[in-house]
Amino acid sequence: MSAADPDAFYRDRVPAHWNRTVDAQERAAEGDAEARRLLDEMQRVRGTIDVVVTGGPTARRYHLNIRAGRMSADAEPVRAPFLVLVHDLDTFATLERESGDSVLGFLGALAGQAGEMKLTATRLQNLLALSGSARLELTGGAPMTLVAHFGPETEQDGPHCSLRIPSDTYAALRAGELAPQEAFLGG
């Protein structure tokens, strides 16, 4: 896969990584009531995340469907997306590097989670209550811009807010060395 072609990333790697996270939670749930509760919540998730990659001759849209907690990349969404992520081809290499196999891992770092974000039915309900768009920008090094649209009909709107984060600050957030409030309040 080249930096200019995100197909394998969104069609194969992201769903495979997501499903490995569910597999790991299934193993953790054996004999652990709290891990079982979390797994049950993860398995109740049914929804769609769309990713739109702009640039090139046409924009590409990937439908990442989640059924019973497991993700697949499909030709059509199973539901209206609760989250639409938009980025261009020029920043794909940075996004791929910063997120590893999971774009939600990238977003989880911004929320202060050092590990993989585990989407539960409760978290999904909270996301469904959101309506708006935000632009996330990594600055310094290899810059990157990602727009996240939450809620119906927000994809047509421009971002309602922008977050600019230096790459070194993001690295500290991702490693769990810096709390989000410290990063954002510290400027």
Positions of PLM-derived features:
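Feature captures hydrophobic
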Residues: 1-186
